[in-house]
UniProtKB/Swiss-Prot annotation:
Organism of origin: Drosophila pseudoobscura pseudoobscura
Protein name: Fas-associated death domain protein
Matches recorded under PROSITE patterns: DEATH_DOMAIN
Keyword Cytoplasm appears in the UniProt entry: yes
Gene designation: Fadd
Subunit structure: N-terminus interacts with Dredd. Interacts with imd.
Chain ranges of the Death domain: 151-237
Length: 241
């Protein structure tokens, strides 16, 4: 895995030479808020803004590649850097996992039984009882509206706001919150990360105010997609009690 040293070298190479900053800014115009876009005066500013928006990092240097069209030295350095870019994942309905796993286990049990009965030297029985139907998975009551009490809501929001940390923008983006809205939240709470995250959670809740189940699925999906499965499991644990 390339280290911070090589990542810093890439950024330094990107800043070398003369470039049309307006042309480079235009590449990211649709992805940045107007306030951030207008604050960019040079390549150093552009790189700083991209990093603050979690669009450029040690593990994702694709924005530098977009800026490299007239910089053969940067293209060569990026090719040597070799950071893989993860393909976007399909959204996963996490509440179907248990049911699908049980269906697979049942299928394997039936297949193994028929393999044994079909083996040489094994006499087939006069009657093979049909496999007992798989009972439906128990209802996950923790995602019903009645179970989403104020106490559990507070516990879920507190857990996410206490542990999400610097992932808050990626989480917000995965939950469908716009960059401009998150800029406003950051301006409102410049030094209070927990309040920033709580405000973000309330905005997400407002979108799903009549559907607690959808809200919880949206939160858990966003946690999964921003790489915080540890928090997702804690949220599910809170809701299961």
């Amino acid at each position: 895995m390339p280290g911070n040293h090589w990542y810093d070298i890439l950024k330094k190479i990107a800043c070398e030479g003369s470039s049309d900053i307006d042309e480079l800014k235009g590449i990211f115009e649709k992805e940045l808020s107007k306030r951030k876009f207008d604050s960019i005066r040079n390549i150093e500013d552009l790189i700083d803004v991209l990093e603050r928006a979690d669009m450029l990092s040690l593990h994702n240097v694709e924005p530098l590649r977009k800026m490299s069209s007239h910089k053969p030295k940067l293209i060569e350095a990026l090719d040597r850097y070799g950071t893989p870019v993860s393909a976007p994942r399909e959204p996963v309905n996490i509440y179907q996992e248990e049911r699908l796993a049980e269906e697979l286990r049942q299928h394997l049990r039936i297949s193994q039984a028929f393999q044994i009965l079909s083996a040489p030297g094994v006499a087939p029985p006069a009657f093979i009882p049909a496999a007992a139907p798989t009972p439906p998975p128990p209802q996950q009551n923790y995602i019903t509206p009645a179970a989403f009490t104020d106490r559990k809501r507070t516990a879920v929001f507190n857990k996410i706001s206490e542990e999400l940390g610097r992932f808050w923008r990626i989480f917000g983006r995965k939950a469908g919150i716009g960059e401009g809205t998150m800029d406003d939240i950051e301006e409102r709470y410049p030094r209070d990360l927990k309040s920033r995250i709580l405000h973000l959670l309330k905005l997400i809740e407002e979108d799903d105010c009549h559907d607690p189940r959808q809200l919880l699925m949206r939160l858990c999906r966003a946690l999964t997609e921003c790489g915080r499965n540890d928090i997702k499991r804690k949220v599910e644990q809170i809701m299961s009690h």
